[in-house]
């Protein structure tokens, strides 16, 4: 089984991924795939370089480029595990790539929704090199994500979790969701 975790930047996807990992489920991060490709091309890991490589990959390999690069990592993990989590799928093209590459696998989409103002504050506090520091940067990044088609992936989710509460409550919701998914599938 493949579990795709999607949501806007800063929504709380990594909390879900970590909860699956606590239960022994390995993961592949789509963002890490792009960062690895950026490093392979000899570029410094800046927001600009990662964005350029992301665009270049899609020009070279198509809109599902990152998924194509992630397929072998997922395949390798599925050889040793019944369940694999993919973090950060952004388009239905990418979902389709995984469905085509793994026709016998059940694929489940889990989406996280978090209000924009909460995501902005989290991203500012997180401090990753590519996180926005102004509301304008934040909105620009959101529009880029939406242009990739992330809203379509969220709309097709099998499970939706809302992260609009204190951290402890969200952690409880995540634990319940992960337990439910693993029990039902």
Curated annotation (Swiss-Prot):
Residue numbers binding ATP: 7-14
Alphabetical list of SUPFAM superfamilies matching this protein: P-loop containing nucleoside triphosphate hydrolases
GO molecular function: ATP binding
Pfam families assigned: AAA_17
Protein family membership: Belongs to the UPF0200 family.
Keyword ATP-binding carried by entry: yes
Swiss-Prot/TrEMBL keywords: ATP-binding, Nucleotide-binding
TM spans (from-to): none
HAMAP family, per the entry: UPF0200
Protein name, UniProt field: UPF0200 protein TON_1344
Species whose genome carries this gene: Thermococcus onnurineus (strain NA1)
UniProt-listed InterPro entries: NTP_hydrolase-rel, P-loop_NTPase
Top-level division of the source organism's lineage: Archaea
């Amino acid at each position: 089984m493949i579990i795709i975790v999607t949501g806007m930047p800063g929504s709380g996807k990594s909390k879900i991924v970590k909860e699956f990992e606590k239960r022994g489920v390995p993961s592949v991060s789509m963002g890490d795939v792009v960062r690895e490709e950026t490093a392979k091309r000899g570029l410094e890991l800046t927001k600009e370089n990662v964005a350029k490589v992301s665009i270049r990959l899609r020009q070279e390999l198509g809109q599902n480029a990152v998924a194509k690069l992630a397929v072998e990592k997922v395949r390798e993990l599925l050889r040793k595990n019944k369940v694999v989590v993919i973090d950060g799928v952004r388009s239905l093209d990418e979902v389709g790539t995984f469905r085509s590459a793994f026709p016998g696998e059940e694929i489940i989409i889990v989406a996280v929704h978090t209000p924009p103002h909460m995501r902005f504050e989290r991203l500012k506090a997180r401090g990753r090199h590519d996180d926005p520091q102004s509301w304008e940067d934040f909105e620009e990044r959101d529009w880029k994500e939406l242009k990739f088609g992330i809203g379509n992936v969220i709309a097709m989710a099998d499970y939706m979790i809302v992260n609009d509460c204190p951290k402890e409550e969200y952690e409880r919701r995540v634990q319940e969701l992960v337990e439910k998914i693993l029990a039902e599938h």
